[in-house]
Curated annotation (Swiss-Prot):
Zn(2+) 1 binds at residues 10, 13, 25, 29. Transmembrane segments: none annotated. A zinc finger (C2HC/C3H-type) spans 6-35, 79-108. Keywords: Metal-binding, Repeat, Zinc, Zinc-finger. GO terms for molecular function: zinc ion binding. This is Zinc finger protein 475. PROSITE patterns: ZF_C2HC_C3H. The gene is ZNF475. The keyword Nucleotide-binding does not apply. It comes from the Eukaryota. Zn(2+) 2 binds at residues 83, 86, 98, 102. It comes from Homo sapiens. The keyword Repeat applies. Its cofactor is Zn(2+).
Length: 108
C-alpha cells in the first residue's frame, strides 16, 4: 500500500497542499480572496476568513493534522453563500454566475 504524503487543507479555498507548500500558498490565496471579494457587490462581500486555531499535541510542537484539516475545511466552507432561489451554496463570485440561469421550480 502506497502512503500519500501528508496534505494540509487551505482554510481559504479548501484545497489540499503539501506541508511545505501550504505556507507559500496561503498568503497568495488570501491576496486573491481579497481581490475577488472587493469586486463583489457590497451585499455579497464576506468577512476575511480567519485561520483556525488548533493546539499542538506533542511536546515538539506538532499539530494534529486531522484536526487542523477539519478546522480548515469548515472555515473554507463557511464562506459559501446560499442561492435565494434554489438554496444551493456557492462561493460569492460563483453565485452571481449561477443566479443568471437559476429559475424557480414551476408549481405542479
Amino acid at each position: 500500500m502506497i502512503r500519500r504524503p501528508p496534505a494540509v487543507v487551505c482554510y481559504i479555498c479548501g484545497r489540499e497542499y503539501g506541508t511545505k507548500s501550504i505556507s507559500i500558498h496561503e498568503p497568495q490565496c488570501l491576496k486573491k480572496w481579497h481581490n475577488e471579494n472587493n469586486l463583489l457587490p457590497k451585499e455579497l462581500r464576506r468577512p476575511v476568513p480567519k485561520k483556525p486555531e488548533v493546539r499542538t499535541i506533542t511536546a515538539k510542537g506538532f499539530y494534529d493534522l486531522d484536526a487542523l484539516n477539519e478546522a480548515a475545511w469548515t472555515s473554507a466552507h463557511s464562506q459559501l453563500v446560499p442561492c435565494n432561489v434554489c438554496g444551493r451554496t456557492f462561493l460569492p463570485d460563483r453565485l452571481i454566475v449561477h443566479q443568471r440561469s437559476c429559475k424557480p421550480k414551476a408549481a405542479k
